[in-house]
Regions:
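C-terminal lobe/tail of nucleotide-utilizing enzymes
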Residues: 60, 64-169
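Conserved catalytic-core segment of NTP-binding enzymes
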Residues: 1-101
Length: 169
């Protein structure tokens, strides 16, 4: 839609999370299950590519597209993980996106949600009902690492209209 393209065009960084499965990869491309190569780009990937080209033409810079691999498993050597990594790398070259590791599958993230917390919030025994564990601290570090890997542009803009992006028709 027009609004979707406009929102994408105004973004400095586009983050697309995918889980470790070929089902999620379908949002980027159709993959041949027999030889692990992509057959075609998805409508979403084509839209993002078009918007990035338009942004390059109108502003001389493009959108930083980052695919974030989420719910990472400790089974890095599983057949599925190896195949998926190969295809994502191939797609990153073709579609010019960066790949960043996201967050692991951690029970602690499910623990935070019902009490309205994120891994970056302050938490202690009073808030959690128990002393924070190494898992809580590891989750926080994982989120901090993800944010660092995104390499987001400086958001400390001056007040007023300086630095604010205006959509180009």
């Amino acid at each position: 839609t027009y609004r979707q393209r406009l929102a994408h065009k105004m973004a400095d960084t586009l983050v697309t999370p995918i889980n470790g499965s070929f089902v999620d990869l379908d949002v980027i491309a159709e993959v041949d299950p027999y030889n692990d190569v992509y057959k075609s780009f998805s409508p979403y990937a084509r839209t993002v590519s078009r918007v990035r080209e338009e942004r390059m033409k109108s502003e001389g810079k493009t959108i930083d597209w980052v695919i974030v691999r989420n719910r990472l498993s400790s089974l890095h050597s599983s057949r599925n993980e190896i195949k998926l990594t190969k295809v994502v790398r191939m797609l990153s070259r073709a579609l010019e996106f960066r790949i960043a590791d996201g967050v692991s599958e951690r029970v602690v993230f499910r623990e935070f949600f019902p009490i309205g917390l994120t891994a970056l919030d302050e938490f202690d025994a009073h808030v959690l009902g128990t002393a924070p564990t190494m898992s809580h601290l590891a989750a926080r570090q994982e989120i901090r690492q993800l944010i660092a890997n995104l390499n987001l542009p400086d958001t400390n803009r001056k007040s007023g209209d300086d630095g604010l992006r205006v959509p180009v028709s």
